[in-house]
């Protein structure tokens, strides 16, 4: 009851509190190299003309996958992981050289070296143990977002823009439930409000996406769509007027443009329709990660980093009524259909449960179930 009361109080405060914050989230392709980061900087600089801005960034494209490979190779005591670490470090050095003025490069390299020193220490421990624990894997994966955001922060500082880097591990708090990291939203929102109140003069904040920590201070990660989730949490916690998700596509499309060349960008769409399209294949947003802003009624703008002048897609509770009867068509790839038939199924208690339990143990998600009224046939996808 106390938790529910505090949630009601927080929502009332949000309605009453005038917001001057906007949250911009950039994905891995948006920060993949110096040229792309320059695009990001231009977008953020223009955004600062409107409101205070909080930027959430993913790791550079491909970095997280490489970090996972590094962890697995270290657990196998395969020295190839050291080569991958060196390659990744060199990649970030190249971004620094291409992005920053000469006088700021030593500072950026020092920040990058700190992260890689930590990575090397963790992987050495993994090698000695011959085991990659979930805690170690989370710590290894966290390096990607730490690297990208520290470089981006120094870029803004080199331009005379007072950017404040915030460590999301100290703000976003998780607890373990059934082996899964679950965000403690009440504590997280309180932390966000508290840290932003400490810097009332700052107009720009840079935050690593995807990473958090538990109540013992151990680094944790937020799973698929983790950076979007981070952005959603900060949007709610900062009482943002809008969440902008900047990616490498022009917004939500009427259909997959790789399949339907005439597909168009959907300019306005409701939360419900956007979540439905995303559930069935549209990969612009991942429904669980944007649920916090949907619950609070914060608009979501999906925009193209490489064509910032394009309208994009505005996702909101009550969009303008569309002329088209069908808003969009989505598709799901790599789907297997399992059909079970036979008289042996009839009248057997728990038969469906046994099937679903078997699929669950093999990390297989079910998106569709049909069953004949005779209970003679059942299909799952």
Task: Please report, for each region that a protein language model flagged, where it lies by residue.
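A conserved regulatory-domain signal marking ACT and ACT-like small-molecule sensing domains
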Residues: 310-381
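Terminal amphipathic helices with adjacent charged low-complexity linkers/tails
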Residues: 57-72, 253, 302, 307-319, ...
């Amino acid at each position: 009851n106390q938790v529910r009361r505090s949630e009601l109080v927080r929502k009332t405060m949000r309605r009453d509190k005038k917001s001057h914050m906007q949250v911009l989230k950039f994905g891995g392709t948006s920060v993949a190299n110096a040229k792309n980061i320059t695009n990001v900087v231009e977008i953020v600089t223009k955004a600062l003309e409107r409101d205070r801005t909080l930027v959430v960034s993913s790791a550079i494209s491909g970095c997280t996958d490489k970090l996972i490979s590094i962890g697995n190779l270290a657990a196998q005591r395969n020295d190839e992981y050291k080569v991958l670490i060196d390659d990744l470090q060199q990649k970030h050095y190249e971004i620094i050289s291409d992005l920053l003025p000469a006088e700021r490069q030593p500072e950026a390299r020092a920040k990058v070296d700190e992260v890689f020193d930590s990575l090397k220490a963790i992987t050495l421990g993994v090698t000695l143990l011959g085991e990659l624990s979930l805690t170690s894997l989370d710590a290894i994966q966290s390096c990607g977002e730490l690297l990208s955001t520290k470089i981006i922060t120094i870029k803004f500082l080199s331009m005379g823009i007072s950017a404040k880097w915030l460590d999301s591990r100290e703000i976003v708090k998780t607890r373990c439930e059934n082996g899964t990291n679950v965000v403690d939203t009440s504590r997280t929102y309180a932390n966000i409000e508290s840290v932003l109140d400490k810097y009332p003069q700052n107009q720009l904040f840079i935050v690593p996406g995807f990473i958090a920590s538990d109540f013992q201070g151990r680094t944790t990660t937020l799973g698929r769509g983790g950076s979007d989730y981070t952005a959603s949490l900060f949007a709610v916690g900062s009482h943002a007027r809008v969440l902008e998700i900047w990616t490498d596509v022009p917004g939500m499309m009427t259909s997959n443009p790789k399949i339907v060349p005439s597909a168009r960008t959907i300019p306005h769409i409701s939360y419900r329709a956007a979540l439905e399209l995303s559930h069935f294949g549209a990969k612009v947003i991942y429904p669980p990660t944007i649920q916090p802003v949907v619950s609070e009624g914060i608009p979501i703008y999906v925009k193209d980093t490489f064509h910032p002048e394009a309208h994009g897609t505005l996702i909101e509770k009550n969009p303008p009524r569309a002329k088209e009867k069908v808003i969009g068509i989505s598709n799901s790839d790599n789907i297997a259909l399992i059909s079970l038939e036979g008289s042996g199924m009839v009248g057997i208690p728990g038969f469906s449960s046994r099937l679903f339990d078997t699929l669950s143990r093999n990390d297989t998600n079910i998106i569709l179930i049909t069953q004949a009224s005779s209970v003679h046939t059942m299909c799952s996808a």
